[in-house]
């Protein structure tokens, strides 16, 4: 027998107040958050700001497209003048074929699936798997001018930081 239970021996209500109190949930004002009139306040959520929000200038919007989708839809892109046919190869700029591609900061080509056509894809970023699939099919993955400029810029800033240190 637990100590508390032992102590309560001989007590009529075992610490529960009067004999009326431990009948159902009435003594507690209902179950859970019952009773919304000034009583459990369940309809008032937490207020105020909390957490951390990165500034808009620090956020980059990345749109993604898979190599398999580019491969499957290459003929459609060529028909819609979104891509060019160069012999057996399709020359595709990922920004042209992704919806809102020119509004995004980065358009990235992801690997996955199969590539049956020779593709020459230009994008801001590629995964290693995407580059591998494109090159296995005889195509090439080229970084866009925008991505190269950003890479040059980051190299310049890191060189400046090294000089200061």
Swiss-Prot record:
One Pfam assignment: Ribosomal_L27A
Q: Which cysteines are cross-linked by disulfides?
A: none
Keyword terms, alphabetized: Ribonucleoprotein, Ribosomal protein, RNA-binding, rRNA-binding
Which residue stretches does the UniProt record annotate as biased composition, category Acidic residues?
150-165
What cellular component GO annotations does this protein have?
Answer: cytosolic large ribosomal subunit
Query: Where is region (Disordered) located?
Result: 1-39, 137-165
Bias type Basic residues, positions:
1-30
Asked if the keyword Electron transport belongs to this entry, the reply reads no
Q: Which GO terms describe its molecular function?
A: rRNA binding; structural constituent of ribosome
Q: Which GO biological process annotations does it have?
A: translation
Matching InterPro entries:
Rbsml_uL15_N, Ribosomal_uL15, Ribosomal_uL15/eL18, Ribosomal_uL15/eL18_sf, Ribosomal_uL15_CS
Describe, as the record does, how this protein assembles with itself and its partners: Part of the 50S ribosomal subunit.
Q: What does this protein do?
A: Binds to the 23S rRNA.
Similarity comment: family membership:
Belongs to the universal ribosomal protein uL15 family.
Q: Which HAMAP family match?
A: Ribosomal_uL15
Q: What is this protein called?
A: Large ribosomal subunit protein uL15
Q: What organism does this protein naturally occur in?
A: Halorubrum lacusprofundi (strain ATCC 49239 / DSM 5036 / JCM 8891 / ACAM 34)
- What gene name does this entry carry? rpl15
